[in-house]
Regions:
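Phosphopantetheine-dependent thiolation modules in NRPS/PKS and related acyl-activating systems
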Residues: 1-80
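Hydrophobic alpha-helical bundle cores within soluble ligand-binding/oligomerization subdomains
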Residues: 78-459
Length: 459
């Protein structure tokens, strides 16, 4: 076996016999996005040649990597056999519809909500303004903002059976409790409409109600598991202050409210992410707003989607100190395991949301007089720098969990807090999907046997 084949096998953690021309990116579980970046870094080290984005896209098959190692220019991926359609595993690079909500330029690191830069919104807007922008299409004037805020305030109260359900789930993980209670709202809400009959106006009303109720579910469950009754925030509190008041059971500091407001804004939407896609698929089935958001919450709790935010805190505790960061990263890479808080399917540079969350962590760390967590995460980011050139840069999950911990909130609330902000985007995407709806039904390429004879002996 050639040295490049050995490099591929060693980097991906597979037997050398599995390194064949038929193997390509995403065709085996070991050659996922992280495995591909690890391969590019290993090839750079072995051959002393920098691998740019264009070459990274070309080196997606064993045959192309063999050509590269032999000093020839690899072709742009294999052509699909005539009798088989091209397969896009993970739907990577597939554009399935159009949107007017969120624009992402992954190369330049740009994120815009309906044309407004995330940097301007995070610095100057309230979450209510951004939610209005998402759902109703424009930033509100004073009168529109007042009406919208009143809608959110009126939606906070939870039905008694849903509160009872949250109490009975005090032992459960907050994401599991949230998913279950959101689903229950469809049965106990004020308006019960079958999804196939739900009008745009009814869907919007339900969406606003969910935007008001979801943080109260998270807060009620947190209160019950801590042996206290839920606290209903005063009507005149902002959305961010209401969220934090309900969670803490007391009035928060202005600095804490400012962070929550900023965190909700940067989490509000991210185009066709996995959970938003799930919500659109459910909407395409005419499942209704509540069912679509229940599906989104379920997807969001997955460990490689929203669930990564909580796992970053496990990483922080395992690393322990800045001095151990480099060795920790090397250990994970050696085992072919991802480093939580790094890498994104879209961005080829740093996630534009990161700077806002890190700035908050800096401020909170200084306020608390404890910068150890920040220094450790920064050291991990430095250790990951060889991978950042290949798209595995810091993402939105890296600093969010530490900020919540500095506010005195447990690590397992990182995902529910992310969900609270993302609800605005889910509602907007469900409404956009509903306005020009279509059943989303892609195909699978069958690879099994054909024309197998059946006899009773097969049973």
């Amino acid at each position: 076996m050639s040295s490049v084949d050995q490099l591929i096998a060693r980097t991906l953690g597979i037997a050398e016999a599995r390194v064949t021309d038929e193997v390509e990116y995403q065709s085996i579980k070991e050659w996922d996005s992280l495995g591909h970046v690890s391969l590019m870094v290993a090839l750079e080290k072995a051959y002393g040649v920098p691998i740019d984005d264009e070459l990274t896209l070309s080196l997606r098959t064993v045959s192309a990597i063999r050509e590269f190692a032999a000093g020839t220019t690899p072709q742009q991926g294999p052509a699909a056999p005539d009798d088989r359609a091209a397969v896009h595993r993970g739907l990577e690079g597939v554009v399935f519809d159009r949107t007017g909500i969120t624009h992402i330029d992954g190369v330049a690191g740009v994120l815009e909500y309906r044309g407004y830069s995330i940097h301007d919104l995070a610095a100057h807007a309230s979450f209510e303004e951004v939610a209005h922008l998402m759902i109703d299409g424009e930033l509100p004037d004073a009168a529109s903002l007042e009406r919208f805020s009143k809608e959110l305030h009126a939606a906070r109260a939870l039905p008694g059976p849903v509160l009872d359900l949250a109490r009975s789930l005090a032992h459960a993980h907050p994401v599991e409790a949230l998913r279950t209670c959101v689903s229950a709202l469809a049965a106990f809400g004020q308006r019960r409409v079958d999804g196939s009959d739900e009008t745009y106006e009814q869907a919007r009303e339900t969406g606003i109600t969910l935007l008001g109720q979801i943080p109260m579910i998270v807060a009620a469950h947190h209160a019950f598991r801590n042996g206290r009754e839920p606290l209903m925030p005063a009507e005149d509190t902002s959305y961010a202050e209401a969220v934090l008041t309900a969670l803490l059971g007391e009035s928060p500091t202005p600095a804490a409210v400012q962070f929550i407001n900023r965190g909700l804004i940067v989490h509000a939407d991210h185009s066709s992410n996995a959970s938003a896609f799930v919500a659109r698929v459910a909407t395409g089935c005419r499942a209704g707003m509540t069912a679509s958001l229940t599906a989104a919450v379920a997807a969001f709790g997955g460990s490689v989607h929203g669930g990564a935010a909580e796992r970053v805190m496990t990483l922080l505790d395992q690393v322990g100190s800045p001095e151990r960061a480099e060795a920790y990263v090397a250990e994970l890479q050696g085992r072919g395991e991802p480093v939580m808080g790094f890498g994104h399917r879209v961005y080829r540079t740093e996630d534009p949301r990161v700077r806002h969350l890190r700035a908050t962590v800096v401020a909170l760390s200084e306020e608390c007089g404890d910068t150890s967590g920040l220094e450790t995460l920064d050291a991990v980011a430095a250790a990951m720098s060889p991978y950042s050139r290949h798209g595995v840069a810091a993402n939105v999950d890296l600093y969010a969990g530490l900020a919540y911990r500095l506010l005195g909130l447990p690590d397992d609330l990182a995902v529910p807090l992310f969900v609270i902000g993302r609800t605005a985007g889910w509602v907007a995407q469900v409404l956009e999907q509903q306005s020009n709806n279509v059943l989303i039904r892609p195909l699978l390429s069958y690879t099994g046997p054909h024309a197998r004879p059946f006899t009773k002996g097969n049973r």
